[in-house]
Amino acid sequence: MKKKFKSAVLFSLLCFLTNAQDLIKSGPMVGYSTMREVLLWVQTNREAEVYFEYYEKNNPKIRFKTERLKTVKKNGFVGKLIADQVMPGKEYNYDVFINGKKIKRDYAMEFQSQKLWKWRTDPPNINFAIGSCNYVNEKEFDRPGKPYGSNFEIFNSIHDKNPDFMLWLGDNTYLRESDWNSRTGFVHRYTHTRSLPELQPLLASTHHYAIWDDHDFGPNNSDSSYWLKETASEIFQLFWGNPNYDVTGNGGITGFFQWGDLDFFLLDNRYHRTSNKNFTGTRQILGSDQIDWLINALSFSDAPFKFIVVGGQVLSTESLYENHAVFSEERRYLLDKIREAKIEGVIFLDGDRHHTVLSKMQESKYVYPIYDLTCSSLTAGAYKNDETFNAYKLEETLVGENNFGVLSVVGSKNDRELIVKIFNKDGEELWRKSIKSNDLKY
């Protein structure tokens, strides 16, 4: 009788623990990092209490806990919690607890706080990954025929590069016709994409930042007239972990973050956008308020490299599709303002085009070259494109297959170097370029 009782207890305990493991829908994911706090994210598949426990890698006996949070259906069972007992320049392991039980994973769950380096040492070496256009197939809602998404092992290849963080350049998910007319559809699509098995190790140990483009905002080529743009903004913020959004106070996801001595300006190319087909008045992608904020923020920045992150190509002279060249007056206004303000170290990062290319614009010998790195696509269909009408393209950098980038910044404070490397889905290097910060000055 006692043996039966013990067996029943063990069986019940095993079921309870298994049930806790099964409650994870996606994640955990590591969001933004600062010197004193880090965002941690997880999604359960039903209502549950979640919290995180974390500790320094070299001092595992002293453990810290986040607050506890109850995930609810209204918020897609998403939990976002802050690790607020971190100290600068430390590496941490963490565990996630669901209904009081620790969830085990067979891959690393770790994060880092940023270093306190200024006035003390040279800035740290920095490595970050970039990519755009991530299409995860769901046959029930996809177009008939050949699946549009493929090569999901690319996320294992990114993970193997061990970047400090990943910067998602838009179209990070693809809303379908069944999604973009309801909040329920948004939550489903973001959940489905975030739950991709190949993505989980990368989410768990690399910090993540993101902007959007049309496909994670609404319908194809969607603009400011989109009827659910506030819902789009809400769900984007729910599923991502940027440190701030809507810094202009006019709606949307415009934001900013720093990593080491680098500054990143996260632009919103959808919320205030004029329809591509509307030529009756002032045409804009970003809008004057966002551009004026950007110029002011760039002027304040003393970063050797100032990365302007936006969903679509800026420098390309091809007046095609959704390039900024199609909105020529605003493009001219933006670039003129950057030159007029004597802002140094500008590099655009963008996606959208389903191919990768580096563009370089230098109007005369009296100004430094501005670069625009287009990196696309991760898993959505990739195509060869010669960018025939892009006067600024560097021919040898065109890539027409699924790919990602790793950008490394090294060197002393007054002599920083950016090394751009593009890899295929298997992590094999396709090309690299070096850009010196001292070459991006007047």
What are these regions (language model features)?
Residues 21-442:
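Metal-dependent phosphoester/phosphodiester hydrolase catalytic core
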Residues 1-23:
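Bacterial Sec-dependent N-terminal signal peptides
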